């Protein structure tokens, strides 16, 4: 078993904070802090075994991470896991959040007016485990689900969605643009998503992809922030008026 001094060196080498160690080992944060500060002179053997088990291991490399590793991360670290690679997510801008909110409202109002439709629209952060893939957990900006009763192969609980949503929307940011436009596009199509919108606030564009049985139905359609766009999830009854949204967000486009 590692000595305390060796654990301290491993902690530095691995770049773990006390919070990281508590989350990954299951040892309470207060106990971890006392051990590594020297406040606790004789920690319990079982506690040291848990810490030794964590700190003795070589850290996984990108491409080797699983959903279990993702779930063990501290709650205040926002990341996505795609094909075993962990991507840190930058804090969203005010424009990013305002756009998502402005798009969410008509969705929500539509569902209030159409209670017969067993649908749900969810704002990020919500975990989506595509195809129950153990190496992928994504947090789209907006997720739409149309429930199919007992025949629905997907599963939704209080923590995550297992399977492909019917509607996904991502708002681009400088740090996520290539991931949203290339990597996630491929993942969403391969998992069986029905519709994927990419909203580009910088160039005021919306690109819409529609899929059926994992096949792109037609060429993607590009719209501007002056257009109205029908939502396939609503059988094209719901129209998102981007010209109206653009007017609402005029302070960001001076």
Where are these regions (language model features)?
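Gly/Pro/Ser/Thr-rich low-complexity, intrinsically disordered segments predominantly at protein N-termini
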Residues: 2-16, 23-24, 29-30, 34-39, ...
């Amino acid at each position: 078993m590692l000595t305390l001094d060796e654990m301290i060196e491993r902690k530095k080498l691995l770049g773990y904070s006390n919070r990281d160690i508590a989350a990954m080992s299951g040892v309470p944060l207060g106990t971890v802090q006392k051990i590594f500060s020297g406040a606790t002179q004789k920690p319990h053997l079982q506690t040291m075994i848990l810490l030794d088990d964590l700190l003795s291991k070589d850290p996984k490399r990108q491409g080797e991470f699983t959903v279990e590793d993702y779930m063990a991360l501290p709650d205040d670290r926002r990341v996505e896991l795609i094909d075993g690679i962990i991507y840190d997510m930058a804090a969203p801008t005010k424009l990013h959040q305002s756009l998502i909110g402005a798009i969410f409202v008509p969705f929500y109002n539509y569902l209030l007016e159409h209670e017969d439709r067993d649908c749900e629209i969810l704002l990020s952060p919500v975990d989506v485990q595509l195809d129950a893939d153990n190496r992928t957990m994504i947090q789209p900006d907006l997720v739409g689900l149309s429930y199919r009763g007992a025949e629905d192969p997907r599963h939704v609980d209080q923590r995550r969605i297992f399977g492909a949503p019917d509607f996904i929307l991502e708002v681009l940011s400088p740090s996520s643009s290539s991931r949203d436009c290339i990597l996630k596009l491929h993942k969403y199509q391969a998992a069986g998503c029905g519709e994927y919108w990419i909203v580009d606030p910088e160039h005021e564009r919306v690109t819409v992809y529609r899929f059926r049985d994992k096949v792109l139905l037609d060429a993607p359609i590009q719209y501007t922030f002056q257009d109205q766009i029908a939502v396939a999830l609503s059988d094209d009854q719901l129209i998102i008026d981007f010209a109206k949204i653009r007017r609402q967000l005029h302070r960001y486009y001076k």
